[in-house]
């Protein structure tokens, strides 16, 4: 579950948030959020959801279940206030105090789900156009930018499919799946080439689904899917940092030993003399 909050306090409260500050946006996420907001380009270091994006189907794909807003909307923006009131009519208030209100987005998709149909698209933009206009139901069909090497099969009863996130860390996600037929596990997580997938310990391709998300083909039955962030540049950076730290420690110790020896040697050669 993620939240969409009205200020930058999500990290302090332990909330996952689709907005934020980052000087190095992932291009796909930037394009996705721009499409979500009706074409408004993102600030070069901020990612924001504007009022036009609150009703976008693309927001549901990001697992945004709760929207945190000020208790009283701005009185200066008459059009925005009216638009927000319409939004409130379909998003019930689940918490309210004098300063904050929490609205529930019941259309939000889960963190992980299974589909048994895939449609090939030529680009991220094509996928976002289809999803933004509700021409494709992402709960049923994944939009992929390449043909999956695995065969998908329609399930007689997809309602029995289950995808349970059993482990979630910054660099690793584990999902237990159960499906009546082969399908695609879709995760509401941003795709990046350094993410690697393993199905029951065996390597599996990671596909870009719906212009942004990660997806992995799964066989029928019960399986464990692991996604790990395995970046060779990250490993190289860590290795260089470790070597540099060891070298710095060694140089510091060496300099200290030389200084100590020099001090001891100087004392041994020091003599005193007295006048007759």
Protein language model features and the residues they cover:
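Active-site-proximal, structured, solvent-exposed surfaces of multi-pass membrane proteins
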Residues: 8, 19, 65, 109, ...
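Extracytoplasmic
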Residues: 1-158, 180, 202
